[in-house]
Curated annotation (Swiss-Prot):
Record localization: Nucleus
The protein's name: Mating-type protein MAT-1
Main subcellular localisation: nucleus
Keyword DNA repair annotated: no
Keywords: DNA-binding, Fertilization, Nucleus, Transcription, Transcription regulation
Family per similarity comment: Belongs to the MATALPHA1 family.
GO molecular function: DNA binding, bending
Annotated DNA-binding residue span(s): 60-117
GO cellular component entries: nucleus
GO BP annotations, alphabetical order: positive regulation of mating-type specific transcription, DNA-templated; single fertilization
């Protein structure tokens, strides 16, 4: 028989760490003494958290901030840009970026913010707040004065879209540059930001950064001259693209209108059930459109038939005396079984028996035609 033994402290700790919340509540209820409950509660407070058997998924490395994205985030707040949505301003921001003389500073600022974000998270390191602190420190133009400082003019085209322009001989292209003639490192930017209360939770390591900026005034002037030429070429290219786009739109509209006209003509032809005239080089310029005239000369057969059916036949009793060998229709000497059409030489009132008015010229087309019941006796 196995002897009972007390569990070790490690076994008790492992048992407690693997219990659920409901099981822990049940254990607390089983402890009756207040002192024991207090000791057990204190033990739970310092106990290590339960380890899950599932391996932790390594966090994917985040992509560093792009210099142009930072530039756009800061200068999209230019007050004159407020009436238009972002999709209308993308081309303008691109033109400003191409001519901006401070690209190196924007590339430098992207590195410290990416480092801070990777350590403490994006929520604890707002990008717009970072630029509001660092850009004035590096003497970059603020959004409200950027266009004026660099000599840009904002206008609206015929379609209501914003456009910007700057003359090629503008004197403003060489101004508005930041502190590009002094050595600035990533650590310097982070330290300055933390001195103003930004990203207090970030811990700067002691390893020096290899990213810094140090340029002379001459290199800055060379860059500004290059920016002038780039701006001039970019403005001309943008204007040329604008003209080409309008020409394409006008051409598409012309084709669309021609299609509408052809469709309308076809609908008219279909409505009148007419076929378009054939087009052939061998077709004569003029052809006869006179319809053939039908032969309307009197026909003796049909004229006689109409007269026979429409003329009145003698109907009176006294009329029989005027005809040779004529009998009355009700003569007693006639056989009652003989059909009247086989009897020769009698007179009768044919119009009173059958209406032959349908055979008259110009008669009513709705008149009832006669029914020849004795046609089978012929």
């Amino acid at each position: 028989m196995a002897l009972a033994r007390d569990p070790t402290g490690a076994e008790i700790a492992r048992f407690i760490a693997t219990r659920t919340g409901a099981q822990m509540v049940q254990l607390m209820r089983c402890i009756k003494e207040p002192a024991a409950q207090a000791a057990f509660t204190a033990k739970l407070l310092v106990a290590p958290p339960a380890m899950s058997g599932r391996p932790a998924t390594p966090e994917k490395a985040r992509k560093a901030l792009n210099a142009f994205v930072g530039f756009r985030c800061y200068y999209i707040t230019i007050p004159m840009f407020k009436p238009w949505p972002m999709k209308k301003l993308s081309n303008l921001i691109g033109l400003l970026w191409e001519a901006d003389p401070n690209k190196s500073l924007w590339s430098l600022m992207a590195k410290p913010w990416s480092t801070i974000r990777d350590q403490i998270g994006k929520d604890q390191a707002p990008l717009d707040q970072f630029f509001r602190i660092i850009c004035p420190h590096l003497k970059l133009p603020d959004p409200a004065s950027y266009l004026e400082i660099h000599g840009w003019t904002l206008a609206v085209n015929e379609e209501g879209d914003p456009i910007i322009s700057r003359s090629a001989d503008s004197e403003f292209a060489s101004v508005g540059t930041g502190n590009t003639d002094m050595a600035i490192s990533v650590e310097d930017i982070i330290t300055y930001g933390q001195s103003l209360g930004y990203a207090h939770g970030f811990i700067l390591d002691n390893k020096p950064s290899s990213t810094f900026l140090g340029q002379s005034v001459s290199s800055t002037l060379e860059k500004n001259i290059s920016a002038i030429s780039i701006t001039e070429g970019t403005s001309k290219a943008a204007h040329a693209r604008f003209l080409i786009r309008n020409k394409r739109r006008a051409k598409r509209q012309t084709l669309r209108n021609a299609g509408y006209r052809a469709s309308l003509d076809q609908d008219i032809l279909n409505g009148h059930q007419l076929d378009p005239a054939p087009v052939d080089e061998n077709m004569p310029d003029c052809y006869s459109t006179t319809a053939p005239v039908l032969d309307q000369s009197p026909n003796k057969f049909y004229g006689g038939l109409t007269t026979l059916l429409s003329d009145q036949i003698s109907t009176g009793q006294g009329d029989a005396d005027h005809l040779d060998n004529a009998y009355l229709f009700n003569d007693c000497s006639l056989s009652g079984n003989a059909p009247f059409m086989t009897i020769a030489g009698f007179t009768t009132n044919m119009p009173n028996l059958t209406d032959y008015g349908a055979f008259r010229l110009g008669a009513d087309e709705d008149v009832t035609l006669p029914i020849f019941d004795d046609i089978t006796h012929i």
